[in-house]
Amino acid sequence: MKRRPRQRYRAIRRVPQAYPGLYLRLKVAPIVPALAATVAVGALADISSLPEDVRARARTLSDDMGTAISEKSQRIFFDTPGLDTLLIRSLSHVARRTATVGRAWARTVVAVGADKDGRMARMLPLIPRRGYDALMTGMLTIGTAVGALRGGAVHVALLRDSAADPAFQDPLPGHPEAQIRRVDAPEQLSDMCADIDELYWSRTIGPAVKITRVGEGEARRWLLSLVGTESMTWRSTNNPADVETNIRLMLGLESAMSVGVVRVLHAAMERDGVPTERWTREPVLICGHSQGGIVAAALASVPADEAGVNVAGILSTGGPNRRIRVRPDVVTVAVTHDQDVMPSLDGSPDRAPDRRVTVGRSLVRPRTRPLYYAHSSSTYTETVRLLERKVRVTPWGRLASAMAALQDFMPAPGEPTRVMHFEIWQDILTPTAEGTWNTVAALERGGSYEPATYHIDYAATAPRLPRIARARRRASIPARLSSALSSLRKDRS
C-alpha cells in the first residue's frame, strides 16, 4: 500500500512574518460566537436574582459549552501547525506598541520636569524594545507587583539513594511520601524520557528529579531527567516548576528551577565524594521535557564556571528554547512535534540558533484533547524510541552522530552506577509594604544574556525591485468581450 506523503516543511512556522494578521483572525473566527455565548451563559449563573435551579442549569451549560470550545480550538490549532506562532507574534505586537506608548509617556514626563524623584528616568532604559521581551517583562512585573508571583528561597531534599540502606529516605515533615518505581539506571535515551513520565506522578510538593552517576574516576558522568511545568496557575506555590520560572527563563533571568537543578547536582556529587573543585568539570547530560528543556539550554548557554555545572549534552523534548543559544561544545538534540504548540511559545520561528540537531514528527489527531496528546511526555517518549530505531537502521549523518554522542553517556554493560532522586521546592515570599512601582523597579535584569535573534523575522520591508519594462496597456472591457465573442462565431463563408 502506498504511503500518504506528509508535509514536513511548515512555512507558517519558518517564515511567520509572511502571513498577515488577517490569516490568524480568519482561522479562529469560528470559535468567537460560541465563546461569546459561553461568556453570556456564564454571566447568567452569577446573577443572584435568578432562581437557584436556573443558575445551576446555566452553570452546567456554560461548563459544557466551554469544554466544546476547548476541543474545537484544539482541533483548529492541531490541524493548522503554526497558528500558535502567529498568535504569539500578535500578542508581541500589542506588547511592543504598549511599550512604545509607555516609553513616549516616560520621556514626556522627564522632558517637562515632572519626574521629581527620578524614577521615570531610571525606568526608561528598562522598557524593552522587542515585542516578545515587552510581553514577558510586562507579565513578570505586573505579576510581581500585585503579589501573584512570589517565589522565594529554593530547597532540595534527598528522596532515594540506591547506595543507602534503606534506599528510600523518610519524608520531611509536611511532605508526602514520594511515589517512585523506576529506580534502575537508564540504558537508553528513551529510558530517561520514560523516567520523566513517572516523575510527573511522584506526588511530591515540588518536582522530583532523577540523577544517575555513571562510571568512576575520569570516566564519571551524570544523567539528569527533568520534568516540565507542573503548576499552571498564575499564583506562586511551593512548586517552582511554574509559570514564573517559565517567564524568567524566557527573559534570561535566574529562575528557581535553574537554581534547584544546580543544587541537586551538587548534592549528588557531594554524596558521591566528588571534590568541590570538580563540580564544574563533571560532564552532565540533561534530558528535559518542556520547561526542563529550557532549563537545560539556559545552563548550557554560559560557561560551566558561571552556570555551576558542566552541561555537555542535552536531549530536549517539546521545549521552547530557540531563544537560547547553547555553547558550541554542547551536543544538543531537540525533538518537537509538528502539532505541539508549546515549542512556539518562545516567539521564535522554527529555526536552529546554534549547532543543535532538530527532529520533528507529524502526529495523527486523536479523538479528544489533541494538544495535550501532542505535548504529552509519553508521546515524546514514543517519538524518541522511534528515533533510536531510525538511527540504528541509518547510522550516518548529523542526527546519528549526535544521538551516538548522547548514547555514550549511558552506562556500558557492567559499568558501576548510582541512582539518586531529589525533590526541589521553594518558599513563598510574604508581600512587602513597598509600593507597586518600587516592586517592579527592583526586578533584576538578565546580566549578559542576549536572546538569539532571527533577523528576517524582524524585517519590516523588503527592497523594491526596479521596473524592467513598462507594462502593456490592457484593452477596455468592451473590446475584450467583442474579441472573445468573435472567436466563438462559426465561419459562414
Specify the residue positions occupied by each region the protein language model found:
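Gly/Ala-rich beta-loop-alpha elbow adjacent to hydrolase catalytic centers
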Residues: 287-300
